[in-house]
């Protein structure tokens, strides 16, 4: 049995030219985690390609997603939303979903809000990987409105039946970070977050029990994928995080791995 000491809690193996081969390579490198998808159709194709890996590996999960970019550019419409809501019961893992209010996508903000609220309402008791660009406050408002999060409320794994919200590559304000922490959210950290002054400050503030790692790789459909490079990336992120937090690397590595296992196996 493969022993996993690293977990990539937000990757896009379905972007790889060979999704199954990418998942096998991750396992062989000792990396577990959560593979996000960007549309319900991509999820179903990936679930077929990864069936064997998902069955044999309790530390590797596939999330059903509907990325806000695909809504914003019209690639996905009402049918995709209906599919995700209808099939959400198939999996405990939802992602990548969320909101992106960057200027180039501002015109679709109301559509994004409506869709995100509907998906959130269908996602109670699940593990969610959430994309929130210039929209963390709105995302938290909408999740609170449907009972996914609440200040001071226990989240998985403390409450096995509860929801676990993971902010992927958090880029909100300090006030929004404090609110998300109070709501019990998790945060998956990647090198781009660590490359900014604000991101590094956030890594020092996030409670240890809410820290996760991510690669966000491959970066786009058809991009080549190298699991060994992912391992090196995750290791480098951990080293940087340990330096920032002034803690032992081995201790932080085990805690982040334990956080991930609790979500994946819960």
Per-segment meaning from a language model:
Residues 1-266:
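Mid-domain alpha/beta scaffold segments of enzyme catalytic cores
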